[in-house]
Amino acid sequence: MTYTPPEPKLDIAELRLSTQKAVAIAWPSAPTALGTEENGVIAQKDVAQSPQPSASTAKLITVLTVLQKHPLGLTEQGPLVTMNDDDVERYNRYYSEGGSTITVHRGQQISQRQLIEGTLLPSANNYADSLAVWSFGSLEKYRQAAQKYVRSLGANRTTIGSDASGFDPSTTSTAHDLVLIGIAAATQPLVRTVMAKKSTELPIIGKKDSTNWLLGTNGFIGGKTGNTDQAGGVFVGVAEKQITSQKKITIVTAVQGDKSVNQA
């Protein structure tokens, strides 16, 4: 399916962070939050945010949870994962439901790194589920591990649902929690590196572009897009901001549940 990610109305280029001055932010209409690596969540619209479907931003949780169990260095490909009938069925199901997919075949071997890149960049739902099942043995065991992981981040209003992709609306979160998850992604070296890529090369299909078309604009170096009928437009953005000649900070924003992807 063709996907246009949300463009946040928070202008990273104009943001001024200071310990002496409050930050004036023109908030979007949707639930929104802002944070930094150093300080966590520093501002949010509507403190009493209600959990809403996270859509594909849940894939950040998937990859971070898997890397807790199966860490990879920046240049490592990791183990080869052999696709089986269940993996093919996942592809067929997501494809039939209009979800983002990448074709797989029984007996095909895909490295852990390729599964991660296919999950984060073109946002393949079947790759996310296959990665989680390979790592934990089942989606239920993945769900338990991921739930424990997000709690360790302080994302206490995030619930991991029935899949690892976020396609099912049972995975829910808040903009506040998505900023915490985005900070975790920005501080994980491999995830930060992968998020910054505009495209990846994958088995059989070749080059696939990132859904995050904001990369390289206004300081954006990463993040994750999300969009479903139930979730609306969801976006976690990671940007770098030079605040002094010697200091650069990483800013994470989250916009959740806007009426459409383009309005988020």
Where would I find each of the regions flagged by the language model?
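Domain-scale selection of a single, long terminal region
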Residues: M1-K9, S18, T244-S245, K259-A264
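Active-site-adjacent loops and short helices of periplasmic peptidoglycan-processing enzymes
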Residues: Y3-H176, I183-A186
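Domain-terminus/edge residues, biased toward the C-terminal soluble/receptor-binding domains
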Residues: P169-T172, D177, G182-A264
